[in-house]
């Protein structure tokens, strides 16, 4: 359990998955979502990142499209971790002395012109405590969703903290430190060095805030002076304006950069993954209760095995927004299994993908008194042929692969991959229609005139929506 930035719907008073945020608003309430720091339960899927990635090669009966989607989702990146020493942290009484940056392009280090940290970075939070304008900027950043897509769509904005960081290899060069709305806290360290000449996002930011743009890579066939104006150069080439590295290829430059920062004691090579731990907390009634009790004395205590499963109460109130389990008069009030004092049940429920991530094992013996039968699972698994939608490529299918490894590790069975073969069938799709009150209409209730769609029976104008997939129900 740890604190995490989440999408918060202020009307429904619940956390929303990134997929439930549409154009910055809750998919159902329509309210602008907020970014909040809340305590959430996680499953440590990141522990298996490399294994999950390497094993994709053996899934030779899976569609190449799904394998590629999982590879990209896990997202292995090789690069360097570099420390940028803050020159003047005492001006804001900061305890932080340096900023760590992960980069996949250490070869462009001499092209750095600024440092940018996420709005959730510890440095940004400390600055905001002492700087009202910085605090206001963070509030604006928190109005965006937490997904990469939401952040990517937003206009690139930054706040100059007034701090500077020393370039680790360029003697005396200082880089201004910004808080930027496009830096993801969930990737790397939540901080970047901006190299505008070779990253379009950094270039847009630099042009907006009048920061230097220094090319340090040029195409191999360009002999004249190479200048970047409004389009970043991201292709192959050789290093320039980089001291002793001039003339090196990009790959050789990366190796030399890592050697240099390691020799100076300001960095090291590092491999990182895009895959993050799976946040499984939901403020919904219909999920499986998380079997945990919170005691003032004993802190977090698991529900004893003899008391499992924890069942949901039937007499719940859905008339108010938020989690009805929080409002239930008796269900959440229990005795601590350790000390017997008054305690409170965990009222968050599991993400529904939690249960579907291991049902393949349950299906081998649905009558078992346990979660599943080890004997039956060993006999039947892995599943020979799985048929399911491609929309599950980086959710259910990846989670099931993780569950197979985790359950094997704790001794429930001996299985690496749950599904030997996978076929992703197509979907039945059709344009969607609503009446003027926002109610869905069947296609046979709608007809098209020369200019618009109207209802068959009354001729009322119909709102034509996007093409939707058919519901499973």
Predicted regions mapped to residue ranges:
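Residue patterns forming the tRNA-binding/recognition surfaces of aminoacyl-tRNA synthetases
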Residues: 1-94, 98-99, 122, 191-309, ...
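Short loop/turn motifs at secondary-structure junctions and domain boundaries
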Residues: 155-159, 284-285, 452-454
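Catalytic alpha/beta core of large soluble enzyme barrels
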Residues: 121-220, 225-226, 231-232
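Conserved active-site neighborhood of enzyme catalytic/cofactor-binding cores
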Residues: 25-26, 139, 187-218, 288-296, ...
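Conserved, non-catalytic sequence blocks in retroelement Pol enzymes and Pol-derived host proteins
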Residues: 71-73, 153-156, 392
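Conserved oxyanion/phosphate-binding beta-strand-loop segments in alpha/beta enzyme cores
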Residues: 61-64, 139-178, 340-375
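Conserved phosphate/anionic-ligand binding catalytic regions in large, soluble enzymes, centered on
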Residues: 1, 99-121, 278, 284-285, ...
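Cytochrome P450 core scaffold surrounding the K-helix E-X-X-R motif
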Residues: 113, 123-128, 366-373
């Amino acid at each position: 359990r740890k604190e995490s930035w989440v999408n918060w719907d202020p009307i429904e008073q619940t956390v929303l998955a990134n997929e439930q945020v549409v154009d910055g608003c809750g998919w159902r309430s329509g309210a602008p979502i907020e970014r909040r720091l809340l305590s959430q339960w996680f499953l440590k899927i990141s522990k298996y990142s490399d294994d999950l990635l390497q094993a994709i090669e053996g899934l030779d009966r899976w569609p190449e499209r799904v394998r590629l989607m999982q590879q990209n989702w896990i997202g292995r990146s090789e690069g360097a971790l570099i420390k940028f020493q803050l020159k003047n942290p005492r001006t804001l009484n900061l305890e932080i002395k340096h900023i760590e940056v992960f980069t996949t392009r250490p070869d462009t280090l001499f092209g750095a012109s600024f440092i940018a940290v996420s709005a959730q970075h510890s440095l940004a939070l400390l600055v905001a405590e002492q700087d009202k304008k910085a605090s206001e900027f963070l509030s604006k950043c928190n109005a965006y969703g937490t997904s990469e897509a939401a952040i990517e769509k937003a206009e690139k904005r930054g706040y100059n903290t007034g701090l500077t960081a020393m370039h680790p290899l360029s003697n005396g060069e200082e880089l201004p430190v910004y808080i930027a709305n496009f830096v993801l806290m969930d990737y790397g360290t939540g901080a970047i060095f901006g190299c505008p000449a070779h990253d379009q996002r950094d270039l847009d930011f630099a042009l907006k805030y009048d920061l230097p743009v220094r090319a340090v890579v040029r195409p191999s066939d360009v002999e004249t002076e190479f200048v970047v104006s409004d389009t970043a150069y991201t292709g192959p080439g050789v290093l320039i304006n980089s001291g002793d590295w001039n003339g090196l290829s990009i790959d050789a430059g990366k190796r030399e950069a890592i050697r240099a920062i390691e020799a100076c004691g300001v960095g090291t090579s590092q491999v990182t993954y895009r895959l993050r731990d799976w946040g499984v907390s939901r403020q919904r009634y219909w999920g499986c209760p998380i079997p945990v009790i919170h005691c003032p004395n004993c802190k977090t205590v698991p529900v004893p095995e003899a008391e499992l499963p924890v069942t949901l109460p039937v007499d719940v109130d859905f008339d108010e927004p938020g989690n009805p389990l929080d409002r239930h008069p008796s269900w959440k009030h229990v005795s601590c299994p350790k000390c017997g004092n008054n305690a409170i049940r965990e009222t968050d429920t599991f993400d529904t993908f939690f249960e579907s991530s291991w049902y393949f094992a349950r299906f081998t013996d649905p009558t078992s008194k346990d979660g599943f039968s080890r004997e039956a699972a060993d006999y039947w698994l892995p599943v020979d042929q799985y048929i399911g939608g491609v929309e599950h490529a980086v959710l259910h299918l990846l989670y099931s692969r993780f569950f197979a490894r985790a359950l094997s590790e704790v001794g429930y069975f001996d299985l690496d991959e749950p599904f030997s073969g996978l076929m992703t069938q197509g979907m039945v799709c059709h344009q969607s229609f609503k009446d003027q009150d926002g109610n869905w209409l069947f296609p046979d209730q709608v007809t098209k005139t020369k200019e618009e769609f109207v209802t068959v029976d009354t001729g009322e104008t119909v709102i034509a929506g996007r093409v939707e997939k058919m519901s499973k129900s």
